[in-house]
Every structure is written in structure tokens, then in C-alpha cells.
Amino acid sequence: MNYEERDTYGIYKPRKNDGAGSRVDKGPGPNLMGADTLVGNDVYNQKDEDLGDIKEIMLDMRSGRIAYAVLSFGGFLGLGEKLFAVPWDALKLDTEHKRFVLNVAKDSLDGAPGFDRSDWPDMADPTWEKNIHAYYGTKPYTADVRTHR
């Protein structure tokens, strides 16, 4: 599923015609997007392999930033699936295909730090945060948040 299919408020719908038969998109997307429309979005890698879908968006209430997208991978109908907290900066929006791209090999997710739905990690723990960002090659932003309080 993609963000346009989840758009119940018309955020991403074409707004008007330019007079020459071409549509002109107006509205906030894709620079600003509704959080609810992101949950359920597909995530692929650069080899066009399906990595799963976004199950949750984790907001840092101290900074107002999106910290992580929780990616679901594997399993069937929720059984055997593994969840991953992917740093938001590791995901890139592919507006052409209306999905997110994560630069990891599909088989590397088997060994990626993850969790199951009954045992969520403490995502505010600095050691956990450091390990997750190191795995995905992103820089934690929370050092800035802690020093600017």
C-alpha cells in the first residue's frame, strides 16, 4: 500500500489543471506528509526487493522529530514477523513508486537488530540508539536534543 491510497483527507490529490491538460499538484506532499498516511507504506531496497512495510512511526516527544519507522519483515499474517526500528534518516521517499527505499540487502535483515511485538526495546536508551544508528550508517540527532534542552 502507498501513501496516496491511505490519504483520506485529500493531502496528495491533484488539485487543478494547468489549462494545457496537465495536472498541477498543490498541497503539502511530498515535503510534508500526514503521519497516518505513512503507516502501511511499502519499503523496498535499491535492488527493488520488498523489505516489508511500515507498522509504526516513532516520534521523539522532546524534539518533535520522527526518530524511527518500525519496519515489519517476514512472517505471514503477523506470525513470525520481525520488527525493526529503522532510523528515519535511513529511509528515502521514492515519489515515483510511492514507497520508501532502505539501502540494505534483503538477506541482511535476518541478522539486523530487531525485536518482536511482545518485547519492544527501550528506544530512548543511548546505547541502544548508538547501536541502531551504527547498523544503518546514520548519525543520531539526539545529542543535539540533549544539549539544547
Predicted regions and their residues:
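Peripheral interaction segments used for macromolecular assembly
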Residues: 1-149
